[in-house]
Each structure stands twice: as C-alpha cells, then as structure tokens.
C-alpha cells in the first residue's frame, strides 16, 4: 500500500508516507466511554501492568519513540483543515508490530464532540497485507476498554496497541479491516470523553469513515461495531446514532462484551472499591468539563468529599497501564469516603448519567457476551439490558460464559463472535 501527502499543512513536511490517503468524498452529516476491561485485572496485578507498559516498537520507516507524542498535535483543527468532514485523515504514519502479513497506520482524523464541534481524534487502521479493490472488505470498528483518559493513555501511542484490540489476528484472518479509535482526549490532547456517549459514538463511526480514505486496503461502507466494557458503551451509542450521524455507513451489527449499559448501577455497584473510585474519577472529570455549562460552579464539590475533589484531577492524569501503583496510592484511602452525594440522584448529575446510558432500541443485530464471574459489570445488569432490548424488539444473540470474568470475557466470546459476524457482515 502507498500513501501520498497532498501538501496539507497538517500532514508534515511533504515527504511520502507509506499508505495513500485519498481526499474524502463530501458528505452531508448531521452535527449532532465504561469501564475498564482492565480495571479489575490490573488493580489486582500491578506487576503485569508494569510488564505491559512499553513504548511503540519501531522499525525502518516507522516513527521513532521520541516522535510519537509529537505526532498527535492539538485537538483543535488547523485553519487549513477545519472544513474537512468527519473521517478525513489529516496525519498518518506506519506502525510496526501488527500481526504477520498485516499493515497498520496510526492516524489523526476529524470527528465531533458532544456539542457537534469539529475535533481531531487519533487511532489505528489495520488491514490484511494484500491489496484489494475498494469496497471489498468489511470494517470492524473496535472500541477499547478503559486505559485512562489522559492523552498519554491512548492505545495507539504505544501501550501494547495491537494486544489491546481483542480478536485482532482472527478478525484480520477473516478478511476484515480493523479500526480502533483512541477516543477524544486521548492521543490528541483535548477534553476527555469517558462515558460520554455522543462523543464516543462519533469517534467510533468516524474512524470507519477514515478507513475508506486509505487506498489499497479495500475498506467498504459495511461496518460491524465491536466493543468491550467502556468500549461496549461506545459501540452501543454508535449503533444508536449511526443512522442519523453516519447514514452512508452500512452498519451490519454491533457486538459488545460486558458493556457499561447502566451507568447509575455501575457506580452504585463498584464505588466501594479501587476500581469504582477510579471509574468515578475518570467519569466525573470528563463530565465536569464536557457539561460545564449545565453543571453548577465547582461541580465536583456537589457530589464528592473534599478529598475526592482534590483526587479527581490527579487520577485523571494517570493511566491504568503503567501507573497503577499511583492510582492505588490515591484511591485506596478514599474507599468509602469518595462521594458526598449519590450522582444517580444529585441534580444535573443524575440527568447526565441517564443521557449517557444507552437505552434506545438497537435496530441492527446485537451480540452480547457476559461472564458469570464478572465483578465489575454485574451479570444481572447485562441480563437486564438484554431483556430490555428483546422486549423492545431488537434482534439479540446473547451468550453467558460461566468461567469468564471481566478481563477474559471478550476473548472467551471470540469464536461465537466470529460465527455471528459471518452471518451479519
């Protein structure tokens, strides 16, 4: 595959990148995150977290480690690129380490935030190595579980980026293009989007659009959404909003593993341990910034203890991978004393949690996987979501895996997921 720098000021110095990114087709587009799959696992296993905290593996033709941070730039589009529609790629570079025979790009692309404003977001595009005609391959848009909310927590920036795309090797072997957004605020600096459904949805859908601008990989408008935990939340919102936000995409189905489908229940179930304090800190920090015009002045003080108010911005700077001990040091003393009020009943906060809970009927085939041993996303919560979708008339394929927990459910479900994808994609 080849790329071209079309002399866009945002793409760099004019040298030829390794894949050809072609100009976008103009679209009429309506303006319109969850929970860590790794939280429970990493909180219990800081040594493993340290082992996984490596930088990008570099090779000839790839950006060296020291250049990765500079790749992401600013979340605010440059004047030369502000008119570009969602999905337009403004920067790209190759990433080594993809499964054998595959090629990967790190990209920065246009998307939108909760207010419909134009922003830049980063992510990965991975494709089988064989070049094929345009429109040949289904695009699987992967929504990752929680890794943090700070820019340096982005999966594409080097926190084992391919290892965190669950099922990547098999999805590529099945002939799919796989894309993986970082979500707004990660990679490219900007406001966090953790568990903000509209922003997550746009980011997940727009990177599927972006794949169509990479020549030679055969990305079609057929899209399957796939997410785990926080990523399940993102994928469900993407499915809810696809018809209006990205009507040109042919979304064939949405698959989720242990999705964050009920935010109020999530906080009530988990706030009494380190995982819950961490999830709460990420969410409350993101909401306080994204919804500043709706929340009272000093919004964190309306639901958090004084110690919690101090801790949230500190925790927001830390990633689950590699900074786990520091998260523990901050969160442990606050277990049982983090909240001063219940966000599920507090004015405005309760409305925001409800708005960002995916309750609409899913109109495309829905695959749901849940582990019986999951203590982060409770099986009863997922069962209630499945029942509500079935009652609303959704087409649901549901699997409960007796031995799976939160960290293992996505990979446990992979064989069933691939079989289901063959029926929809």
Residue ranges and their predicted role:
Residues 27-38, 45-132:
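Catalytic-loop region of hydrolases
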Residues 74, 257-358:
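Accessory cap/linker subdomain of secreted extracellular hydrolases
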Residues 113-174, 187:
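Short, surface-exposed "cap/lid" segments of acyl-processing enzymes
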Residues 194-215:
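Alpha/beta-hydrolase active-site loop
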Residues 210-279:
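Primarily recognizes the serine-hydrolase "nucleophile elbow" in alpha/beta-hydrolase
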Residues 341, 345-351, 356, 367, ...:
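C-terminal catalytic histidine-bearing segment of alpha/beta-hydrolase fold enzymes
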Residues 362, 367-374:
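Short beta-strand/loop motif that positions the catalytic acidic residue
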Residues 372-377, 407:
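Acidic catalytic loop of the alpha/beta-hydrolase fold
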């Amino acid at each position: 595959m080849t790329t071209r720098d079309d002399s866009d000021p945002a793409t760099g110095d004019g040298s030829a990148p390794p894949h050809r990114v072609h100009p976008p087709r103009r679209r009429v587009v309506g303006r319109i995150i969850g929970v860590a799959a790794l939280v429970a696992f990493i909180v219990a296993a800081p040594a493993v977290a340290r082992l996984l905290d490596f930088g990008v593996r570099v090779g000839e033709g790839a950006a060296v480690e020291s250049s990765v941070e500079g790749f992401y730039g600013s979340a605010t589009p440059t004047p030369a690129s502000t008119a570009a529609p969602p999905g337009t790629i403004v920067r790209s570079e190759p990433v080594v380490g993809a499964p054998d025979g595959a090629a990967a790009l790190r990209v920065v692309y246009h998307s939108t935030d909760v207010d419909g404003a134009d922003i830049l977001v980063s992510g990965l595009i991975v494709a089988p190595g064989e070049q094929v005609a345009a429109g040949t391959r289904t695009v699987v848009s992967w929504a990752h579980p929680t890794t943090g909310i700070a820019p340096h927590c982005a999966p594409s920036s080097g926190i084992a980026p391919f290892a965190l795309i669950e099922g990547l090797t098999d999805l590529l072997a099945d002939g799919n293009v796989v894309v993986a957004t970082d979500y707004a605020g990660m990679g490219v600096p900007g406001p966090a989007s953790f568990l903000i459904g509209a922003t997550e949805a746009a980011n997940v859908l727009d990177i599927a659009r972006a794949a169509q601008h990479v020549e030679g990989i055969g990305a079609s408008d057929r899209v399957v959404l796939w997410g785990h935990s926080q990523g399940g939340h993102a994928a469900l919102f993407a499915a809810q909003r696809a018809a209006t936000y990205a009507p040109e995409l042919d979304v064939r189905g949405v698959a989720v593993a242990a999705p964050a489908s009920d935010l109020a229940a999530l906080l009530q179930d988990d706030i009494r341990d380190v995982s819950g304090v961490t999830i709460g800190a990420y969410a409350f920090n993101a909401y306080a910034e994204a919804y500043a015009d709706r929340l009272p002045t000093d919004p964190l003080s309306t639901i958090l203890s004084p110690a919690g108010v101090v801790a949230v911005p500190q925790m927001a700077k830390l990633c689950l991978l590699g900074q786990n001990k520091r998260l523990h040091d901050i969160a442990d003393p606050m277990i049982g004393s983090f909240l001063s009020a219940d966000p599920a009943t507090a004015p405005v906060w309760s409305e925001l949690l409800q708005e960002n809970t995916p309750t609409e009927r899913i109109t495309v085939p829905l695959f749901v996987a849940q582990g019986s041993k999951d203590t982060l996303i409770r099986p009863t919560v997922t069962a209630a979501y499945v029942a509500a979708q079935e009652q609303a008339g959704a087409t649901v394929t549901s699997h409960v895996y007796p031995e799976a927990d939160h960290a293992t459910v996505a990979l446990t479900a992979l064989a069933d997921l691939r079989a289901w994808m063959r029926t929809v994609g």
